[in-house]
Regions:
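Short Trp-Ser/Thr-centered turn/loop motifs at beta-strand boundaries
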Residues: 29, 40-50, 89, 128-137
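Beta-strand-rich extracellular modules
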Residues: 119-121
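Acidic, Ser/Thr
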Residues: 61-63
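Short, surface-exposed beta-strand/strand-loop-strand elements in extracellular ectodomains
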Residues: 65-83
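Edge beta-strands of jelly-roll/beta-sandwich modules across compartments, strongly enriched
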Residues: 68-70, 112, 123-141
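Beta-sandwich interaction modules
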Residues: 43-49, 89-110
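N-terminal prepro-regions of secreted/extracellular proteins
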Residues: 1-49
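Extended extracellular/luminal ectodomain segments enriched in beta-structured repeat modules
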Residues: 49-57
C-alpha cells in the first residue's frame, strides 16, 4: 500500500504544469498618459511585475508634438529602487499611432519589475495609450 502511495505521489509530481499552475505573464493593459512641457522633462508609469523574457507591449492611441524617447526600466523592487534602463539599444522612438513591442532585458538582467518611461529631448509633446510589461502577441518592433 505504501509503495502504491509513493508511486502515485511521484506520478503526480512528474506531470507537466497545467495552465492554471503555470506562471501567467503580465499582459493586462494599463493606461499611460505622458505630457512633456519641454526638453528635459520626463514621465513614467507605475512599476509592474514582469513575469517573462518577452518584449514589453505598447499601444499608442494619441500623440502630439515631438515624439519622446521611450524606455523600459527594470528594478528588483516594486518601489523602483535601483532602477536601470533595460531598453535594447538604449531607447526607442514611437513613429506614430499603433501597437508595438519594445525589446528589453529586464528579466535577463535579473529584475522582476518594469515600468515605461518617456523623456522629451526635442521639446514639448504628449503620448498616451496602454502598455503591459509582457507581450502576448507579435507587433511591430521598435528596436
Amino acid at each position: 500500500m505504501l509503495v502504491m502511495a509513493v508511486a502515485f505521489a511521484v506520478a503526480l509530481l512528474a506531470q507537466p504544469a497545467t495552465p492554471a499552475q503555470a506562471k501567467v505573464a503580465t499582459t493586462q493593459d494599463s493606461s499611460f498618459s505622458f505630457y512633456f512641457s519641454g526638453a528635459g522633462t520626463t514621465q513614467g508609469t507605475s512599476w509592474r511585475s514582469k513575469d517573462t523574457y518577452s518584449s514589453t507591449y505598447i499601444n499608442v492611441t494619441s500623440m502630439r508634438g515631438n515624439a519622446p524617447r521611450m524606455y523600459v526600466d527594470g528594478s528588483s523592487y516594486s518601489s523602483g529602487y535601483g532602477e536601470h534602463n533595460c531598453t535594447n539599444g538604449g531607447y526607442v522612438r514611437v513613429p506614430g499611432l499603433g501597437k508595438y513591442e519594445i525589446h528589453n532585458s529586464v528579466r535577463e538582467s535579473g529584475y522582476r519589475f518594469a515600468r515605461l518611461t518617456g523623456w522629451a529631448d526635442n521639446g514639448w509633446g504628449s503620448i498616451s495609450g496602454v502598455w503591459s510589461p509582457d507581450c502576448a502577441g507579435n507587433y511591430a518592433d521598435l528596436n
